[in-house]
Amino acid sequence: MEIKTNAKIRVRLESFNHELLTSACRKISDTIQNSDATKLSVVSLPTDKRIYCVLRSPHVDKDSREHFELRVHKRVIEIYYDPTVKCRIISKFRITVRSIISY
């Protein structure tokens, strides 16, 4: 008799475009649900917002400035699965697998 244990994969996705990130999460969740994974959860992380201040004039006029903003949207997908089943993960985006936890 074979004893099955559950394992967990945590996948972190980052993107500057939140619509692209949402579609990537949807594609990954559709792929995982078609396989034999037992549970899937998508968690939204706080958005990093960086503001850069640039002087417009090269010499004087410090009052004249421009502000640029860069936002990084993040999601974490946790996949609970049976270790004997191999899951396919879409690799079109920047994906980092932080940890594989087996319990």
From Swiss-Prot:
Keywords: Chloroplast, Plastid, Ribonucleoprotein, Ribosomal protein. One of its GO terms (molecular function) is tRNA binding. It is found in: Plastid, Chloroplast. It comes from the Eukaryota. Pfam families: Ribosomal_S10 (PF00338). GO terms for cellular component: chloroplast; ribonucleoprotein complex; ribosome. The keyword Acyltransferase does not apply. InterPro entries: Ribosomal_uS10, Ribosomal_uS10_dom, Ribosomal_uS10_dom_sf. Its main location: plastid. Gene3D superfamilies: Ribosomal protein S10 domain (3.30.70.600). Part of the 30S ribosomal subunit. Involved in the binding of tRNA to the ribosomes. PANTHER family: 30S RIBOSOMAL PROTEIN S10 FAMILY MEMBER. Belongs to the universal ribosomal protein uS10 family. This is Small ribosomal subunit protein uS10c. It comes from Trieres chinensis (Marine centric diatom).
